[in-house]
Amino acid sequence: MACAEFSFHVPSLEELAGVMQKGLKDNFADVQVSVVDCPDLTKEPFTFPVKGICGKTRIAEVGGVPYLLPLVNQKKVYDLNKIAKEIKLPGAFILGAGAGPFQTLGFNSEFMPVIQTESEHKPPVNGSYFAHVNPADGGCLLEKYSEKCHDFQCALLANLFASEGQPGKVIEVKAKRRTGPLNFVTCMRETLEKHYGNKPIGMGGTFIIQKGKVKSHIMPAEFSSCPLNSDEEVNKWLHFYEMKAPLVCLPVFVSRDPGFDLRLEHTHFFSRHGEGGHYHYDTTPDIVEYLGYFLPAEFLYRIDQPKETHSIGRD
């Protein structure tokens, strides 16, 4: 599998916190960005298999939307234990957003990878979730992947943030009451793009939507048999929902594409109340509250980049 490597620009956490504080103020009424110790992510509401997101941080973009649209390429299946080795971090803790492994589940779904990959010393732990459309009523069904299957796969496309899963210093972002047009992730990404320009910065981590509701989507269980050639056609195919807090989100974003046909931002989420999917934006700006923990990635790994590409379905 082809794999290209790129070194991100990595400012200090203090510098990033200052830049993000300033940019988020344009879009949220109350903003507080600081450098803190990473909270214990094995605890509620995260319940990750590791305590933190620190150590040898990297972003991997695997496959891409052109393997899903206009028509699916069903050969594109990836093993996250192998991806960890590909990004030179066996045993990596991986989180992010991707497409569910249809070949084992038997249907298409939104995938929320939360995986401690295998190392010489430890077996892998799969804390991932997947969300699919309930055939009975068109609602959302959110399930723990390990309760259905025992592999470590995903399919078609994935945006992943990987680290050693260690405790350490992180950037904490608190943002309340949205006053501007941008969603939480886009605001952070565009802030970094404006400030750092042609020095690309990659970020990942986790955030909680503590109050409010969000617009989300889930892909249908069946891939489209007729080509989806525009965003309008894609939106007719997707199932859209409004989902309520609290939601645990797994964002991966890059300030500027250094020439690898990247999806600049991608965020999936899960919850304890059976809702999960792909995050678009909050629908309750007056009451929304975000609390996040982020780190810059040292490296980008672009794995199995599609040779033929397009810009459909990147939202």
From Swiss-Prot:
Intracellular or extracellular location(s): Nucleus; Cytoplasm
InterPro entries: C11orf54_DUF1907
GO biological process, one term: DNA damage response
EC assignment: 3.1.-.-
Molecular functions per Gene Ontology: hydrolase activity, acting on ester bonds; zinc ion binding
Cofactor: Zn(2+)
Keywords (A to Z) from UniProt: Cytoplasm, Hydrolase, Metal-binding, Nucleus, Zinc
GO CC terms in record: cytoplasm; extracellular exosome; nuclear body; nucleoplasm; nucleus
Pfam families associated with the record: DUF1907
Binding of Zn(2+), residues: H266, H268, H278
Function summary: Exhibits ester hydrolase activity on the substrate p-nitrophenyl acetate, in vitro. Regulates DNA damage and repair by regulating HIF1A degradation via chaperone-mediated autophagy (CMA).
Oligomeric and partner information: Monomer.
Name of the protein this chain belongs to: Ester hydrolase C11orf54
Natural source organism: Homo sapiens
Gene coding for it: C11orf54
